[in-house]
Amino acid sequence: MPVVRVLRRVACWMLQSPACGCRAPVLPSRFLGTSPRQIPMDANFHSTSFSEADQQRVLITGGLGQLGVGLASFLRKRFGKDNVILSDIRKPPEHVFLSGPFIYSDILDYKNLREIVVNNRITWLFHYSALLSAVGEANVSLARAVNITGLHNVLDVAAEHGLRLFVPSTIGAFGPTSPRNPTPDLCIQRPRTIYGVSKVHAELMGEYYYYRYGLDFRCLRYPGIISADSQPGGGTTDYAVQIFHEAVKNGRFECNLKPDTRLPMMYIDDCLRATLEVMEAPAESLSMRTYNISAMSFTPEELAQEVLKHVPELQVTYNVDPVRQAIADSWPMNFDDSNARKDWGWKHDFDLPELVTTMLNFHGSESRVAQAN
């Protein structure tokens, strides 16, 4: 027994000795398989150091949403096909399944998420699992579970395993009392949707984990994202995607927002590039953990006028959805993204004319292929 006591003292001395360069972290009790989920006061996690030249191992949660598939394709060009794992709780379409690694991942299942990170040696995690604004209002309890409880699981796994974590935020993180034109990075945030509330929660929790545990948390507040190869997913800005589908398909479009509703928008290529750029930015260049990013700002009427230059036969009508309109009226009209441009060199490529041309070219080509088939 004296030998055991001596060995125990030596082990404790080694763990706390300055010679080892760090103090061994005390893991949250949940990491040890116990309950309740409580983080001790002296816990201290620091992201595993790695050279930027090292090959990243990437996990994307909520990968079958509007942005996940495009992000996976974009990152695979940078890190290699097999180093970017797409995940979701739904069965992927065949083309997604064949394009690279795909696995089942339920962010509400902490053990499952932890096993994926460990078994695949994940270093970067992009957390896209969320219920969007309009869908969230229709199912608040589910939105609360996915957007908040799921986030807690992701934060804990990322902290435990020293990951670099990206969590997208949104224009929906602001509310009617926020300055709207422009909206700065730091101002009052009192959103009126469960989606917005959950995103403010994510921003603050990520920042807390950064300061408290050393988690390398990075976040961008996305404007409305417009993408050619995905269907609208229940967001308030979906009209700006749907108009292109309808213009090419049947020449008629009914908008559910007022014609003068101005919101910040961005083409998906700019969005994906900004996401990678902020993740690759040197830590010392980041003055904050959450940044606004923007590219353009327009109204449904301005978008329709630009589309009409290419599709003059398009008929646009307005049938305002009061729920979505109320949400849009509480959101920023313009984003101030000067900090992102100053700190890590953000610069957008697509303005409204380029956006419209690109979207119509894509859907026009898609329509011609369908007709040929």
Curated annotation (Swiss-Prot):
Compartments where located: Mitochondrion
Catalytic activity reported: L-threonine + NAD(+) = (2S)-2-amino-3-oxobutanoate + NADH + H(+)
GO molecular function: identical protein binding; L-threonine 3-dehydrogenase activity
Gene Ontology CC, one term: mitochondrion
Pfam families: Epimerase
Recorded metabolic or biological pathway in which this protein acts: Amino-acid degradation; L-threonine degradation via oxydo-reductase pathway; glycine from L-threonine: step 1/2
EC numbers: 1.1.1.103
Keyword NAD: yes
Alphabetical GO biological process terms: L-threonine catabolic process to glycine; threonine catabolic process
Family classification: Belongs to the NAD(P)-dependent epimerase/dehydratase family.
Biological role: Catalyzes the NAD(+)-dependent oxidation of L-threonine to 2-amino-3-ketobutyrate, mediating L-threonine catabolism.
Name recorded for this polypeptide: L-threonine 3-dehydrogenase, mitochondrial
Species the sequence originates in: Bos taurus (Bovine)
Gene field: TDH
